[in-house]
């Protein structure tokens, strides 16, 4: 807000980038790894204000290049990855991540084409559905088979022919329960929570796993035996890979029972259909298509964002154009964790002979 006031007070057409370096304080629940996650840390924050999107793009890439040079000169082995914008918002973000086994960022990377993204942001390439004749929908007795592995072993079925269900409850701005959500992915997949909340259009902290009994009373689901057929009073989110699948196995919403012959479109449909799964190692790269995706961990040392007009509109960061009209700035924001960068350097360059005099 202070920087917005500085820029807005000039009331002129002038693209600019401002920065600040200051100590910040956070009520960190689990401080750990020295300077990596502490309650007190030093940050460098930059903000760009441009008259149009083209100018914002230039400012963004200027900061991108500057961060590359900074971390290279620091001697870091780092990777630039596409990142989720998270609560900050905006249209695009890149994270600068120093590779380290103690890092909290999970990364997906293609060694062939260079595609890289945080695991929460990484796109998936859907497998093509198997073409076969639709079978009759049947309810099958499957006693004690509450996990995907249990039911697939019991029915002698490939796990890729099963449907996994996860049940959630979402909250409104007053943190009152808003609605139940059931997310469905193929049995060998995991739900990507960031993709799910983005699909729902809610903040990450507005969702949690539902109480099975409470949700069952409203929707008809049964813990361990939940499936998409016949669910009521809940939002159904279906992973895009399930579209077109036939003869799948899913919970029957009845204790000790599953449905076989489940076909998308005939037996159920999603209220929301999109990619909500985690990109696994060895899967196809979303950019070049080669099945060589690798996972690694990294320390987030910097991140940059294209914010657009999200904050400039709400904070009335205007400039006067050539005709004297009020126009909204296109904003970008850019941050480097200075103390975290120091810790990342130590993590990558330490040995048994390291002492404080060498730092």
Locations of the language-model features?
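Single conserved hydrophobic/aromatic residue that forms the stacking wall/gate
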Residues: 1-8, 13, 357-358
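Acidic/histidine-enriched segments that form metal/cofactor-coordinating
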Residues: 17, 25
């Amino acid at each position: 807000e202070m920087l917005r006031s500085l820029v807005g007070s000039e009331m002129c057409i002038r693209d600019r980038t401002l920065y600040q370096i200051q100590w910040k304080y956070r009520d960190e629940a689990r401080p750990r790894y020295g300077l990596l996650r502490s309650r007190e840390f030093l940050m460098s924050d930059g903000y760009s204000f441009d008259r149009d999107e083209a100018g914002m793009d230039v400012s963004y890439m200027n900061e991108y290049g500057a961060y590359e040079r900074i971390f290279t000169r620091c001697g870091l082995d780092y990777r630039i990855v596409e990142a989720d914008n998270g609560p900050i918002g905006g249209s695009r973000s890149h994270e600068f991540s120093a590779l380290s086994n103690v890092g909290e960022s999970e990364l997906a990377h293609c060694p062939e084409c260079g595609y890289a993204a945080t695991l929460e942001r990484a796109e998936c390439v859907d497998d093509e559905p198997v073409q076969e004749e639709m079978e009759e929908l049947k309810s099958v007795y499957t006693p004690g088979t509450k996990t995907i592995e249990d039911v697939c072993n019991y029915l002698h079925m490939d796990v890729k022919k099963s449907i996994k269900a996860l049940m959630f409850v979402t909250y409104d701005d007053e943190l009152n329960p808003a609605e139940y959500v059931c997310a469905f992915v193929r049995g060998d997949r995991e739900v990507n929570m960031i993709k799910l909340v983005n699909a729902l259009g809610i903040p990450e902290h507005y969702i949690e796993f539902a109480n099975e009994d409470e949700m069952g009373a409203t929707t008809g689901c049964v813990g361990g035996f939940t499936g998409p057929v016949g669910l009521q009073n809940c939002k159904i989110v279906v992973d895009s890979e399930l579209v077109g699948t036939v003869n799948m196995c899913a919970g029957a919403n009845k204790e000790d029972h599953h449905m076989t012959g489940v076909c998308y479109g005939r037996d159920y449909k999603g209220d929301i259909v999109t990619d909500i799964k985690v990109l696994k190692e060895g899967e196809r790269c979303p950019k070049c298509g080669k099945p060589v995706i690798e996972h690694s961990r990294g320390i987030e040392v910097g991140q940059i964002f294209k914010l657009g007009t999200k904050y400039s509109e709400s904070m009335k960061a205007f400039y006067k154009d050539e005709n004297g009209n009020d126009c909204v700035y296109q904003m970008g924001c850019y941050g480097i964790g200075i103390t975290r960068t120091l810790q990342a350097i130590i993590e990558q360059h330490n040995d048994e002979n390291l002492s404080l005099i060498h730092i």
